[in-house]
């Protein structure tokens, strides 16, 4: 199955506090055939969406206006929902618990996003 087939029709949660980046991610996800089902620009909204929305996969900005997103990652992980961290600081900046987890370096390109989301989904499925 190709990367585009894997992503086609998926419901995606975007957690990002910068509105321009949010819009860019939304456009990229639409180009990949995904549907954005939620966009959270702050920690509280991210937690609410992570707990209640039907989500196939998520992209999480690590730093939400000074608040770290890792409790949201815990919620998604507990629900069995794959996700990708987006960080300007690099994967090495992730805490030990999340070292080696799927991440993409900002600024994100559509290819980076597709590869990261595809990897997160494959790892969650164990394939």
For the regions a language model picked out, list residue spans one by one.
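Two-component/phosphorelay signaling modules centered on CheY-like receiver
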Residues: 19-38
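Acidic, metal-coordinating helix/loop segments flanking the phosphotransfer/catalytic sites
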Residues: 39-57
């Amino acid at each position: 199955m190709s990367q585009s087939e894997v992503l086609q029709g998926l419901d995606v949660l975007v957690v990002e506090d910068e509105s321009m980046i949010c819009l860019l991610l939304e456009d990229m996800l639409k180009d990949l055939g995904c549907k954005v089902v939620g966009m959270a620009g702050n920690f509280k909204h991210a937690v609410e969406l992570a707990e209640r929305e039907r989500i196939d996969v998520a992209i999480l900005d690590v730093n939400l206006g000074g608040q770290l997103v890792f409790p949201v990652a815990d919620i998604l992980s507990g629900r069995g929902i794959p996700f990708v961290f987006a960080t300007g600081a690099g994967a090495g900046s992730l805490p030990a618990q999340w070292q080696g987890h799927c991440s993409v370096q900002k600024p994100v390109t559509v290819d980076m996003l597709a590869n990261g989301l595809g990897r997160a989904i494959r790892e969650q499925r164990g394939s």
